[in-house]
């Protein structure tokens, strides 16, 4: 692909790290590419609506109610220069819950929340209007996914088609509860952070911090990848890749791809070379020996970076 391709344009201009004055910029870049190339019909387009917590989005209108969902969808359609979105995802739960790696769930009565049907009704109207085609969740729990699926079945409302949650060699917590729901209910995982912010490429080994890398740009925002057990696990996985003469990043991605509950693996890249390397992982084979060795490391260092 030439350097002027959509992937190149997006990776050169994407808003990383995201800030108040850059949110929505990636949609604009993609929208400009659609307008220029007329290739919208060749692309499966997914985007998200932000939940509570970012008060500068839509003037603080972060609830998943009909008004804010309509405003968010219309804003995305305008930036993307299209009249429909294939997959529209709720970025994180509106209710109080454990997501973004949070542990130690503590429930309180004031945290009771039961807007599943209201949200699905609003989504149903958006689907019937033709503005979106399918609905997905992100950073969701097994209970949340199950409740959405239950309500959609009872009320004949749109069904959750996917869940975009983190999954990698360093964070396999999805297997604990959500994997079974994904398989039985055919609501597959779109795995994000499969390379654990780049740690599973080996580029941060020995304390290295490459210029323009995510950890350089984000600073101390993702310290969970720097834990002692996380670093030890990374070294062990790196040893497996070296032993079997595998590219470390490709091995990490392929492991995710092989899981039966995964629909797709979301990759990110800073350069076209990185993008090509990531894509080539689809042609890699992982032997049973490699998979056994990976699982042994998981037993020693279980989910060190949730």
Q: What residues fall within each predicted segment?
A:
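Aromatic-lined substrate-binding rim segments of carbohydrate-active enzymes
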Residues: 16-38
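Single conserved hydrophobic/aromatic residue that forms the stacking wall/gate
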Residues: 1-7, 11
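Acidic (Asp/Glu)-rich catalytic clusters
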Residues: 33-44, 79-81, 127, 149-155
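A short acidic, helix-capping loop that chelates divalent metal ions and anchors anionic groups
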Residues: 16-18, 53-58, 97-98
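Active-site mouth loops of central-metabolism enzymes
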Residues: 55-67, 107-114
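Glycine-rich anion/phosphate-binding loops
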Residues: 23-28, 62-72
């Amino acid at each position: 692909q030439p350097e002027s391709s959509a992937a190149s344009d997006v990776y050169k201009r994407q808003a990383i790290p995201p800030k108040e004055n850059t949110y929505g910029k990636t949609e604009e870049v993609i929208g400009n590419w659609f307008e220029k190339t007329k290739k919208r019909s060749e692309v499966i387009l997914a985007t998200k609506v932000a939940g509570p917590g970012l008060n500068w989005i839509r003037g603080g209108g972060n609830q998943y109610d009909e008004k804010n969902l309509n405003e968010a969808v219309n804003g995305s359609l305008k930036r993307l220069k299209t009249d429909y979105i294939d997959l529209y995802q709720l970025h994180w739960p509106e209710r109080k819950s454990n997501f973004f790696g949070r542990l130690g769930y503590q429930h309180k009565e004031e945290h009771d929340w039961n807007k599943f049907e209201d949200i699905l009704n609003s989504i149903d109207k958006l689907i019937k209007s033709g503005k979106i085609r399918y609905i997905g969740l992100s950073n969701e729990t097994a209970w949340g996914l199950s409740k959405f699926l239950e309500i959609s079945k009872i009320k004949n409302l749109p069904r959750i088609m996917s869940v975009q949650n983190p999954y990698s060699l360093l964070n396999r917590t999805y297997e604990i509860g959500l994997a079974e729901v994904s398989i039985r209910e055919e609501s597959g995982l779109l795995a994000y952070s499969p390379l654990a912010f780049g740690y599973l490429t080996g580029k941060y080994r020995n304390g290295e911090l490459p210029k323009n890398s995510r950890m350089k740009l984000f600073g101390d925002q993702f310290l969970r990848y720097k834990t002692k057990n996380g670093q030890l696990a990374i070294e062990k996985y790196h040893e497996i890749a070296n032993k079997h003469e595998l590219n470390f990043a490709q091995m990490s991605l392929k492991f995710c791809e092989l899981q039966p509950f995964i629909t797709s693996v979301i990759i990110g890249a800073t350069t076209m070379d990185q993008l090509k390397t990531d894509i080539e992982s689809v042609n890699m084979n992982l032997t049973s020996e490699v998979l056994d060795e990976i699982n042994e490391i998981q037993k020693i260092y279980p989910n060190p970076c949730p």
